Amino acid sequence: MNNPDDLIVITRFLRQQHVLTLCAGSGMDMWCANCFYVFDEAKMALYLMTEKHTRHGELMQINPQVVGTIATQPRTVALIKGIQYRGEITELKDDAELIARQHYCRRFPVAKVVSAPLWQLNLLEIKMTNNTLDFGKKLYWSRLESQ
């Protein structure tokens, strides 16, 4: 069962960060990419911009199931905070794309001059390590358990 206190810490972390590692795969072909993201707390989703013709973009179109990480870069192990996630990604279209693009461009103004597609990564499962709470402390969230 999801712990509401865990979710508070997880969502705060997701709001504070802006770069994720996205890993996509199909069969034995896998690829990772770093992308800027905007967090939509109400939907527990991340919006990101990337081209369809990239290696990870092509893989996401074949298999929308993705995994990845979001992490800080602390100088000491006691300050490590990071998320491992599993999700499903879809290219946004029509009104959903326009709304997400407004949020994305507000956070990253340089994106206003880029015409790359916007994607919605619906988070399905999160495991967060937060050594600032306790060494090796793990926090969890699952979409299935929140429904």
Swiss-Prot record:
This is UPF0306 protein YE0465. Gene3D superfamilies: Electron Transport, Fmn-binding Protein, Chain A. SUPFAM superfamilies: FMN-binding split barrel. Belongs to the UPF0306 family. It comes from the Bacteria.
